């Protein structure tokens, strides 16, 4: 009985430390990203993912970092992870669509735009931008 109470007390004492470490890494990553310290920010977001593997925002920021570092494969991989975790993440769908347009992948871009139209709430104004870029791709 005493062993159980001791275990419960330890868990209660250690749990808040892991939760604060988790948000601490993400917040540090945001600050570093805003200061364009991409390598350091990347490390902080990866640390956040270790503590919270379903942190869609960490994956989203990693994709933005890889975009800035011109690592398109890693950008796409992280955007796909965000969409896997949250299929209604507008920003991830928007960024993945832009990436596919830049890669001249017409069919994927078209599917993503249609998906974007269905779930759009905050970034609906960006749909016109996507459609015009897709039309430019079509005329090439």
Question: Where do the language-model regions lie?
Answer:
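Register position in tetratricopeptide repeats
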Residues: 34-35, 68-69, 102, 133-140
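Canonical positions in the second alpha-helix
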Residues: 48, 81-82, 115-116
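Canonical tetratricopeptide repeat
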Residues: 61, 95, 129-133
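Terminal, low-structured helical/coil segments at or just beyond the last alpha-helical repeat
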Residues: 110-140
């Amino acid at each position: 009985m005493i062993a159980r109470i001791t275990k419960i007390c330890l868990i209660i004492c250690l749990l808040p430390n892991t939760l604060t470490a988790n948000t601490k890494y993400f917040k540090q990553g945001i600050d570093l990203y805003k200061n364009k310290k991409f390598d350091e920010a990347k490390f902080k977001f990866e640390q956040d993912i270790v503590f919270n593997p379903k942190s869609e925002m960490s994956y989203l920021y990693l994709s933005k970092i890889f975009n800035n570092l011109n690592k398109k494969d890693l950008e796409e991989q992280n955007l796909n992870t965000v969409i896997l975790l949250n299929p209604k993440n507008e920003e991830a769908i928007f960024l993945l669509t832009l990436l596919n347009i830049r890669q001249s992948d017409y069919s994927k871009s078209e599917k993503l735009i249609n998906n974007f139209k269905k779930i759009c709430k905050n970034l609906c104004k960006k749909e016109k931008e996507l459609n015009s870029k897709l039309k430019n791709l079509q005329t090439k």
